[in-house]
Amino acid sequence: MEESPPKQKSNTKVTQHEGQQDLNTTRHMNVELKHRPKLERHLKLGMIPVVYMKQGEEILYPAQSLREENLIQNFTSLLLLQKLCPKDPENMVRKSWASCVPEEGGHMINIQDLFGPNIGTQKEPQLVIIEGAAGIGKSTLARLVKRAWKEGQLYRDHFQHVFFFSCRELAQCKKLSLAELIAQGQEVPTAPINQILSHPEKLLFILDGIDEPAWVLADQNPELCLHWSQRQPVHTLLGSLLGKSIFPEAFFLLTTRTTALQKFIPSLPMPCQVEVLGFSGIERENYFYKYFANQRHAITAFMMVESNPVLLTLCEVPWVCWLVCTCLKKQMEQGRVLSLKSQTTTALCLKYLSLTIPDKHRRTQVKALCSLAAEGIWKRRTLFSESDLCKQGLDEDAVATFLKTGVLQKQASSLSYSFAHLCLQEFFAAISCILEDSEERHGNMEMDRIVETLVERYGRQNLFEAPTVRFLFGLLGKEGVKGMEKLFSCSLHGKTNLKLLWHILVKSQPHQPPCLGLLHCLYENQDMELLTHVMHDLQGTIVPGPNDIAHTVLQTNVKHLVVQTDMELMVATFCIQFYCHVRTLQLNMEKQQGYALISPRMVLYRWTPITNASWEILFYNLKFTRNLEGLDLSGNSLRYSVVQSLCNTLRYPGCQLKTLWLVKCGLTSRHCSLLASVLSAHSSLTELYLQLNDLGDDGVRMLCEGLRNPVCNLSILWLDLYSLSAQVITELRTLEEKNPKLYIRSIWMPHMMVPTENMDEEAILTTFKQQRQEPGDKPMEILGTEEDFWGPTGPVATELVDRVRNLYRVQLPMAGSYHCPSTGLHFVVTRAVTIEIEFCAWSQFLDKTPLQQSHMVVGPLFDIKAEQGAVTAVYLPHFVSLKDTEASTFDFKVAHFQEHGMVLETPDRVKPGYTVLKNPSFSPMGVVLRIIPAARHFIPITSITLIYYRLNLEEVTLHLYLVPNDCTIQKAIDDEEMKFQFVRINKPPPVDNLFIGSRYIVSGSENLEITPKELELCYRSSKEFQLFSEIYVGNMGSEIKLQIKNKKHMKLIWEALLKPEFKFDHLCDQEFCTILKNIMISPAGDLRPALPRIAQALKDAPSLLHFMDQHREQLVARVTSVDPLLDKLHGLVLNEESYEAVRAENTNQDKMRKLFNLSRSWSRACKDLFYQALKETHPHLVMDLFEKSGGVSLGS
């Protein structure tokens, strides 16, 4: 193997460990053989790492020439999360845990996208804020932007001049002019000041550490125009720049720890927020190759870290990664065996001090160094003069030692000193607080002074986010106290130290809800007693929101927390185990719908990818579960290695998990051998949920082997039995018989719908009679017969009272039983009564309750009003497919939404298709089903297919829907399709029962254009847009066949044949409209006389004009973006000459007028293309025009 090239010189010497005997020659040889492919790849590419230091900032890159290296590739390893643009700039803070599902946090980006369109506003930002935890790599990222721009690899077309400022250095200046400021931001002058300032829109100002100095950057003179040579206070100059009173066109990149910038930049405009999340998994390993010059040392060090999941997770933070590498390097230099058992950042810092600082300086000089650090933190200072060092009692020998070991750095430009990293300064400041408190021993007064100083420096809201406070918690833990006592050869009083922690908690907690910051502090402390006590007290701090109308117990039953990084995942899972009010932990990925649990739980959300390292640290923390009894990983795709790690944890003696949900995790028979090994071990697992996985017969047989083991404690196993062979099902039943405590459940299995024959009250009529005209008010509209209520005297017409509210009225003439086939509603009344029925949307009510977490909507929602006592029974429809003619009422509930809140009522009976309430009280009400974890996706439902045909002369277009059998959804789809001149073709529903969340393939005869070809069966409220496939047929000269198949098994679940009965090619517009008034699509797929509501809609149309002609004035005035519309028409309707003629007009209104002038010669087909393009570019405008015109326009 080639030798690494010699290391280049740097400003700070990095001691080489060359020629020293290997710690273990055999181990090094084995390591080298294992990693040889990676080493050869690095050598081939010239990726031999070197560490460069520049003014205290560690810059890492391979030893290639600057001309050849690709800066973007080498430095974009940090994970960047672009956040959604906040609606309120004062709310730009990290969310704490809450009782509601968090909104999506954003998406991952590359460094090239920093000034790209914001995902919230779609506008390119002028201000980008790089935020992140301490030591996460913000400054490195900012310097990279400047350097990559200089090398011509980043934003070269965007900016002519880029200026970099370290705010810690900038704060040393009293006054500066704009010219002097710009000069400081350049390494060498690049152009005269007048030339630079002539194009402010091409300037980028990078302000690193904007929150570090103690300043308020207020724009004190917003209307004052200053000359570029006029000097003024630095904070005023920066405030004017950020406030846009100077160079409003300029761009800014700020780095900060906190997002609460409004406090010291009052005039800050709405920014684009990007959070730095640290190293990815592969970059943690790459860092070791960049840090250690000797490849063998790099491999040895990383293997030691990789074997410790906690240490590997800590290395996600670049500064901590440097700390780990430095400690290991010191051990190599001192000839020690590599050993690093630290579990926290605090412990790593103590280890660092013990390895780097000689004993002779620890007692006095380190204390002086701590005092220097503390004074700087309280005064927001990071640069110190020689007099500052002397003032604290630091002698020259000690300063030289601190410089040599890298604790301090000397700034060549300003002859001042700084700590190697701000985090290191904060660590020394925390030590100062403890030593000062221990020496003073002034009791509560001294503690109050320390806490008030911390609050004054960081603020109550951000107290737990401050590294100094986190280090305090770590140092005051049992291990931290031992480390300090050993380091400083002193005795610290445990009770006094514990009091200091309680002072911090008492001062801050009333002002701050539970958050990740507090969990970080508790994690650093590691004290079991403190963790248990604090986590127990958190239960009382979470209260329901003002809009929550459900019971408080439901609100506090679930906590939601966003964890973006492995570090946050580790901290959260470690602390949650001490939270006695949480019994189950659930992990949800981005855009994944949560699976409901019935036990009190914590739901962790993650918008960033979950890697193998993420799973490793999660399972590592679950080896000792304490209060946790359940783990739900449903919906997460689990690799074989992940399931292997999970099973290793389940077999660990300290793991007390009893319930495990692995629903829809992509498991196969290969994973079953691992799960079987857990069942055969002395694990505490009693319930296992494996639905929606393709386990197969072989996989289930492996599980049976585990179940047969006498030590198996499992009592409940959930499986999908319908996909298994009869032989395997028999084997499972035999197991149940031999083991009375074992219950294998799979009650929701596909089966045929049970017919409702021989049921007097519930008989569904299959023929329709001629509708009777009832006397009444003229404004009321009589509906078709399928909406009638059928009773003892025949059909009773339903009257439409309010189309917008979907409010209907029916006057039942006498006592008896009345049933409406189209809605499924059924009333039993004792006398004549008038009933009002309003179709409601579940989304109006469910969003205010936690009902969705524990129950599933299984029917329409009605607001029914009737005279008290007149209705003795109401039959409410549901679409759950029941196997038996009479089902248990235990899981079915009727949800009532009343003024004081929500009430769940148990029905008197549950039958296929409906539930029965006797002597009901009315309010908005509908049927819901109580669900167990993840059962939502394997409950069989009855569904319907809806096909709509567009009334158009020259083409045939169909819309195909697959939805649950809910009349409110069907009504909403009917209304929506009618707006666009689509009418329904009645076809039978699917024969088999289907499942929510399953996907189905739509196919048909040749030459059909189907978009999309895949449909997901999902329940969406009637107020939401429903999923459908659009099928373009063209000229329908012959019959066409449509099919729907299950995507997983490709089983045919529905099929229909459509036959053409009329051809319209030869008809003129007037003839077509005459036919249009008298047609609709029949159940058999042919054409028959229309129902009155369709004919009435056509009669009410303002004219028989095309949509484009009807709404010409509105379209000219309201189309706000014409160019996208023209792009869609180009080549189809507009030739090149017409396209350019319209674009040449100055305003959007003139462009639309020009377009309408050209449209005089267009055919109906061309106008249809215009309409389709308009619908794609301005959908809300089209819908608004339809609604205002009564919902009908022809030719569209």
Curated annotation (Swiss-Prot):
Q: Summarize the subunit comment.
A: Interacts with DPP9; leading to inhibit activation of the inflammasome. DPP9 acts via formation of a ternary complex, composed of a DPP9 homodimer, one full-length Nlrp1b protein, and one cleaved C-terminus of Nlrp1b (NACHT, LRR and PYD domains-containing protein 1b, C-terminus). Interacts with DPP8; leading to inhibit activation of the inflammasome, probably via formation of a ternary complex with DPP8. Interacts (via LRR repeats) with BCL2 and BCL2L1 (via the loop between motifs BH4 and BH3). Interacts with NOD2; this interaction may increase IL1B release.
The annotated region (UPA) lies at: 923-1072
Disulfide partners? none
UniProt note: domains: The CARD domain is involved in the interaction with CASP1 and CASP4/CASP11.
Q: Where is this site: Trigger for autolytic processing?
A: H896
Q: Which gene encodes it?
A: Nlrp1b
- LRR repeats: which residues? 627-647, 684-704
Give the CARD domain ranges: 1106-1189
**Where does the protein principally reside?**
cytoplasm
GO terms of biological process kind:
innate immune response; pattern recognition receptor signaling pathway; positive regulation of inflammatory response; positive regulation of interleukin-1 beta production; programmed cell death; protein catabolic process; proteolysis; pyroptotic inflammatory response
Q: Where in the cell is it found?
A: Cytoplasm, Cytosol
- The species is Mus musculus
What name does the UniProt record give this protein? NACHT, LRR and PYD domains-containing protein 1b allele 5
Cited InterPro entries:
CARD, CARD8/ASC/NALP1_CARD, DEATH-like_dom_sf, FIIND_dom, LRR_dom_sf, NACHT_NTPase, NLRP_HD2, NLRP_Inflammasome
